[in-house]
Amino acid sequence: MIEFRDVWFWYQEGKTVLKSISFSFSEGTLAIVGPNGSGKTTLVKMLNGLLKPKKGNVLIDGINTKEVSVAELSRIVGYVFQNPDAMFFEENVFKEVAFGPKNLGLNEEEVKKRVRWALEAVGLRGFENRNPFELSGGEKQRLAIACILAMKPKYLVLDEPNTGLDERGLQDLINVIKNLRREGSSIILVTHDIELVLEVADKVLLLKDGELKFFGSTKEFFELDLEGFGLKEPELVKISKDVGINFVRNVEELLKVIGL
């Protein structure tokens, strides 16, 4: 379980970025949303110890992040950064994904097994000999996820994973997230894309000006006045409300509900 207990953070005195944040999350897909500058990335950097609370505590499965190293936390919390290119340095996809498990001290057979599993999970089987830097934007994003998956962390943080993706890349990402969820991964997703939230999130955490404004189910989130928080309500949600339908995640669900 991830627990934030009255967490405060500031980069310099007089400019508080997070204010008394408290919540707990154990499984599923949690989307963290909010306007620019609301503290989203600051919050998730506390999950693997890149940042430590100035006041309060962050606990990961009972471990206080103030008391352990980033390396120790990385075995529990995997972090995929916004720019996947910054993660790559090997000459091919196989070596890239194998790097993490090798550093965990696993034997060669287990490393190969994890690489195969991770590439299968993100739809990149057959890419083993490809140069990471020659992949498309969506393929690079999926490779970055595979690199972290191969280390088998309990929690996976995706920070703005759909940045720069075209429609096909976004759909591939959605499929990866759904696949990982089916396999039991717990995912923390930071995004500005409210339609992505609608499609994949089980719970939503809303930040504004460093304050926790909402934490609850995706259904409850879309009952809020999103525009009042500087967020755009998806057209699908508007249409659903107009025709008196409670909650659907995509067009296919909407058509099924109305009998088309």
Curated annotation (Swiss-Prot):
Its main location: membrane. Its EC number is 7.-.-.-. It is a peripheral membrane protein. InterPro entries: AAA+_ATPase, ABC_transporter-like_ATP-bd, ABC_transporter-like_CS, ABC_transpr_CbiO/EcfA_su, Co_trans_ATP-bd, ECF_ABC_transporter_ATP-bd, P-loop_NTPase. It comes from the Archaea. One of its GO terms (biological process) is cobalt ion transport. One of its GO terms (molecular function) is ATP binding. CDD domains: ABC_cobalt_CbiO_domain1 (cd03225). It is found in: Cell membrane. Gene3D superfamilies: P-loop containing nucleotide triphosphate hydrolases. Keywords: ATP-binding, Cell membrane, Membrane, Nucleotide-binding, Translocase, Transport. One of its GO terms (cellular component) is ATP-binding cassette (ABC) transporter complex. ATP binds at residues 34-41. Residues 2-234 form the ABC transporter domain. It holds the Pfam family ABC_tran. Probably part of an ABC transporter complex. Responsible for energy coupling to the transport system. Belongs to the ABC transporter superfamily. This is Putative ABC transporter ATP-binding protein PH0132. It comes from Pyrococcus horikoshii (strain ATCC 700860 / DSM 12428 / JCM 9974 / NBRC 100139 / OT-3).
